[in-house]
Regions:
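Intrinsically disordered, low-complexity polar regions and short flexible loop motifs
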Residues: 468
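Short arginine-rich
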Residues: 496-500
Length: 510
């Protein structure tokens, strides 16, 4: 029996957001059940820690230097072949409901089809998907959800005003003044989380059992802004939320942690260096209070609970159609969120667990007869496309650089899964940052800093995460670890694929 594939993604969710991964705040029972009944990959990393490059890797099974989407604001050529094309060519119906972000949101509609689909009353086909209905976590003027909300003008005006003439907004309506916390008077059932699950069920309802489907259900949350329906504030009292383990109200302690790392970490914290273009220009993390960190975490976990319930709703629909027996379900995110770790917020050129370490779960179809398992060996987004092909019983496209995910730790060892790679390359005028990371199964994480406006190419980070899971002691310059550093950097550059000769232009900020 041919198997269906449901890929569920969130945007900016930490590994420890889920109960099955040690989370203690949000109730994520539906996603936790996928873990219990399926395979939980305990060391999955993205290949880039921001949206567009990470999503391009999911779409192609390629590392960043191969697909060329090095940072937000870049887009693969529209004609570039993707895993959605490949599955479609082999008999699958294909759809994406929710956040795509394969093209810049702030790019011109004339240049990018995603930015004019809704205004043209189109749902595709596009980039291999027969059907697309798009949503974002703010109103940029051209998503299907944006158009849907035109029927609710008062509620639409209640959403966070994300972009101002100064760039990304920092305004707040929260109890603590925390940036981008914005409870709003909007019914939950028209909020984008439930909209995505409802549109997913609607498309699935058009499918028959005689043809397989590949459906990507992509939630815009828990990405900032944290503008949740105010009716849901009762779920988690921000005053009861514990501070993150890697946050301290002692500024001197935070600074001592940051001083272990290269200069742009401390520079972001105190506002002395502007290298993180993924956060509002006017936001200075050092100004955050402990209560603001608590409130942001509470809003994030409320969004996580809403996502979990939406996931449960769609899984219930699959049960009603008797599709669980031949449907494989994947759950992951594009990247994480600092969420107060090291006194920081948002994301950027920081290769730490908060941003790289992903929730990553595969619930195989019942007909696959695959036992539940936990896999400790490293895997990544780069492996998803090849796994989808293995499920479909087809060979992956030649451009795929990953391999099918192991279904047990024994299989991971047989596959010789020892490393996973993550890249960062951003260029904004004179400000550029270039980081390359390798995580090894023995627990070492090594990040090489290449030459940039700030670094001369000799800097880096090295952590023994078995002894130092919080990445507080940087061993890069420790003579006792010089051999480890050399071996890992050599392995890193030997393992990275050749860089594509195609230099994609950056067309918009995001």
């Amino acid at each position: 029996m041919t198997r269906n594939i449901l890929l569920i993604t969130t945007d900016q969710m930490r590994y420890d957001a889920l109960g099955c991964n040690g989370g203690k705040v949000a109730n994520t029972r539906n996603i936790d059940r996928l873990s219990t009944e399926g395979i939980n990959y305990r060391r999955a990393h993205n290949q880039n820690v921001v949206c567009m490059p990470a999503r391009a890797t999911i779409m192609t099974g390629q590392h960043v230097r191969s697909h060329g989407v090095r940072m937000n604001g870049m887009s693969m050529p529209e004609e570039r072949h993707t895993i959605a094309h490949h599955l479609k060519e082999h008999g699958y119906n294909t759809a994406l409901l929710g956040k795509a972000h394969f093209e810049p949101w702030l790019g011109s509609p004339e240049d990018f089809f995603e930015n004019r689909m809704a205004s043209e009353n189109s749902t595709g086909p596009h980039r291999g998907f027969d059907h697309m209905e798009l949503a974002n976590h703010f109103f940029e003027g051209h998503s299907h959800y944006d158009k849907y909300m035109d029927a609710y003008p008062e509620q639409k005006r209640a959403f966070y005003p994300m972009v101002t003439n100064k760039g990304q907004n920092t305004a707040s309506k929260g109890a603590t003044g925390a940036t981008q916390v914005w409870p709003m008077d909007i019914p939950r059932d028209i909020y984008h989380t439930d909209w995505v699950s409802q549109r997913t069920k609607s498309w699935l309802g058009t499918q028959s059992s005689d043809k397989p489907w590949f459906c990507w259900m992509s939630f815009p949350d828990p990405h900032h802004p944290w503008d949740i329906p105010a009716s849901e504030l009762h779920r988690i009292n921000w005053k009861d939320v514990p501070l993150p383990r890697l946050y301290s109200e002692n500024r001197s302690l935070l600074e001592s942690w940051l001083n272990e790392k290269p200069a742009h970490w401390r520079g972001y914290f105190d506002g002395s260096l502007w290298t993180n273009l993924e956060s509002p220009r006017e936001f200075i993390p050092a100004d955050m209070t402990a209560d603001q960190v608590r409130e942001i975490n509470a809003m994030t976990h409320i969004e996580n609970e809403l996502i979990d319930e939406a996931v449960g709703d769609v899984i219930g629909f699959l049960h009603s159609k008797q599709w669980m027996k031949n449907t494989d379900i994947f759950f992951t995110t594009d990247h994480g969120e600092l969420q107060g770790d090291f006194g920081l917020l948002f994301k950027g050129p920081y290769h730490v667990d908060a941003l790289m370490h992903l929730p990553f779960i595969w619930k195989p179809a019942e007909t696959a007869n695959i036992s539940p398992a936990e896999v400790a060996s490293p895997v990544g987004h780069v492996d998803l496309a090849s796994t989808f092909c293995a499920i479909a019983g087809i060979s992956p496209p030649d451009y795929c650089e990953g391999k099918p995910l192991p279904t047990s730790e024994d299989e991971a060892v047989q596959q010789q899964r020892e490393i996973v790679l993550t890249e960062w390359d951003s260029e904004h005028g004179p400000i550029d940052m270039h980081l390359k990371s390798i995580y090894h199964r023995d627990g070492f994480l090594c990040t090489a800093y290449e030459k940039s406006h700030l670094y001369d190419g000799t800097e880096g980070e090295l952590y023994d995460m078995k002894e130092d899971p919080d990445q507080l002691r940087n061993l890069w310059s420790d003579p006792g670890y010089a051999v480890h550093r050399t071996e890992l950097t050599d392995r890193l550059y030997a393992s990275l694929p050749d860089e594509t000769t195609e230099k994609l232009p950056r067309k918009a900020p995001v």
